[in-house]
UniProtKB/Swiss-Prot annotation:
Any matching Pfam family: Phytase-like
Alphabetical keyword list: Glycoprotein, Secreted, Signal
Annotated organism of origin: Arthroderma benhamiae (strain ATCC MYA-4681 / CBS 112371)
Record's protein name: Uncharacterized secreted protein ARB_04696
InterPro entries, per database record: Phytase-like_dom
Length: 512
């Protein structure tokens, strides 16, 4: 199943002594009376985490508008802020747009059309929930619509792995990753074809209502209309583009279902993004004029692909206030690390917590979702040691690394062991919300570690969205403001009862 969690947060602008005991400014009434679970100062702002206040699920055999399994959509979510409201009975409602990644791929990537799911959310707070008196799920998630994505000509996008070499282009667009497939792209008969490969991982809504979507294959950022047609494509600097044998190679070494033994040689790109480590993080400024996109972990020219060394992740900033996106700045985020309890070699045990999402905060800082892997529901291990929504903050000391030398194909800002070059200062990184606290999870019968049961947290938490506790109030400088942080998990379409209407394909996951 796909799961969702809601946390209560407070953001305080400026250095206010009142934040120590959680008191609001004079004349500003707090909407929640929860105790402070965690308080952190990052840059010039102080933040409070007041606990888990909501939980909901979607059955793993649910289907979308087109009859395909409603899975994987926790890759990223975006809330229509104008839709978020508090009802007279104290409940909350709003509309979320959620994006799945490239589809069910346990046995190989598929020719599944990329899509966005429109969801209705309803939250009924459970203020009396405790570990000894837990609440049932209190977040309702309802499918409202499914939007299919196409290229500029209206041809469906695909989740198939991109070709080892080559690309596809259209007037006014850069060369984009393409999959050339035989038959129907599922192993059956058909005419074959070529489609843009998309492994979507991030989504935001622009001021014009269009969707910006970040991708792992390119890694690129695409703009789609409300009808799902591609309008623009942002190609990042050459340093991000994967290259094998000195040539552009968009393949992620993820063979298709009809050719599961296909080999990619070399498997890892020598430079650029590593396989399945593309643009996981995408967010937009509060005024809708600036896009930020963050690579999941270090480029292979900056310390990747080894987990021990891939902690120096690059962030790009684009001005989207005009008709054409403009690349303006580039920064470094030094990702968190943790000790892998299952690694027998102590010299290899400290590894990078790759990030799965970023979210712009009203203060100008960012939330960043960093986590471990292979721990949780249906995973190899049940206990996760690192799942956090942390904070990153840019200051006057943060280095803008945008330059021709850093952005060229083999440009590097760190050693092969992930040590930043002299003179580069990354964004401040501050620990904040810990997903794994059983003292909070238990309020909704959830747990981290222990039995493989229906209450064990899913492995892949990959999305962040922020909505106000009091939707009638705007953000006030130097004031205390309260928000719900909504996070969805990506279940990778894991199910024993899956279906794809594309060719009446029925599937189940061996890992379930």
């Amino acid at each position: 199943m796909v799961s969702s969690l809601i946390y209560s947060l407070c953001a305080v602008s400026g250095l206010l002594a009142t934040t120590v005991n959680g008191l609001p400014k004079k004349g500003h009434r707090a909407e929640t009376s929860l105790p402070i679970v965690k308080q952190t100062k990052c840059g010039s702002h102080t933040y409070q985490y007041n606990g888990l206040v909501g939980y909901g699920t979607v059955p793993s055999n649910a289907v979308d508008k087109y009859g395909d399994t409603l899975g994987g959509f926790g890759s990223s979510i975006a809330i229509e802020q104008a839709s978020w409201k508090k009802n007279s009975d104290g409940t909350y409602e709003g509309i979320a747009w959620a994006i799945p990644d490239r589809g069910w791929n346990t046995q190989g990537t598929l020719n599944v059309q990329s899509r966005i799911q429109k969801l209705g959310l309803k939250l009924t707070l459970a203020p009396g929930a405790t570990v000894s008196n837990p609440s049932n799920p209190n977040l309702e998630i309802k499918l409202l619509d499914t939007l299919l994505l196409t290229d500029p000509d209206g041809t469906p996008m695909t989740g198939l792995d991109a070709d080892f070499s080559g690309n596809i282009s259209y007037p006014g667009f850069p060369g984009m990753p393409v999959a050339t497939y035989p038959g129907d792209g599922f192993g059956g008969s058909g005419a074959g074809g070529r489609r843009i490969s998309l492994d979507s991982e991030g989504i935001v809504i622009g001021n014009d209502g269009a969707f910006w979507v970040s991708d792992e294959y390119g890694p690129y950022v695409y703009k789609f209309s409300r009808e799902g047609r591609m309008l623009q494509a942002i190609q990042p600097p050459d340093a991000y583009i994967p290259r094998r044998n000195g040539k552009v190679s968009f393949s992620a070494a993820s063979p298709p279902i009809y050719e599961p033994d296909r080999q990619t040689d070399p498997e890892d790109p020598e430079t650029g993004r590593n396989n399945n480590q593309g643009f996981e993080g995408l967010t937009i400024s509060r005024d809708g004029k600036t896009l930020y996109v963050l690579i999941q972990s270090a480029l292979n020219n900056d310390g990747g692909p080894k987990k021990r060394y891939r902690k120096q992740a690059r962030m790009l900033e684009y001005d989207i206030s005009g008709t054409t996106p403009k690349y303006t700045h580039e920064y470094v985020v030094t990702l968190a690390t943790f000790v892998d309890p299952h690694e027998q070699d102590p010299s290899k045990a400290t590894i990078t917590a790759s990030q799965s999402e970023i979210h712009y905060l009203p203060t100008g800082d960012f939330l960043i979702l960093s986590r471990d892997s292979n721990a949780g529901r249906a995973a190899q291990y049940t206990e996760s040691v690192y799942r956090h929504a942390d904070i990153i903050s840019k200051s006057t000391q943060t280095t803008d690394i945008k330059s021709k030398s850093n952005d060229k194909a083999d440009g590097s800002i760190a050693s092969s062991e992930g040590v930043l070059d002299d003179g580069i200062n990354p964004l401040d990184y501050c620990s904040f919300v810990d997903y794994n606290l059983n003292s909070e999870l238990g309020k909704f019968r959830l747990h981290n570690g222990g039995a493989q049961d229906e209450h064990l947290l899913n492995e892949k938490w990959e999305s962040l969205a922020l909505v106000p506790v009091d939707p009638s109030k705007e953000f006030e400088d130097n004031g205390k403001n309260e928000y719900f942080l909504i996070s969805f998990s990506d279940n990778d379409y894991i199910t024993q009862d899956g279906t794809s209407s594309s060719l009446l394909l029925f599937f189940s996951s061996a890992s379930e």
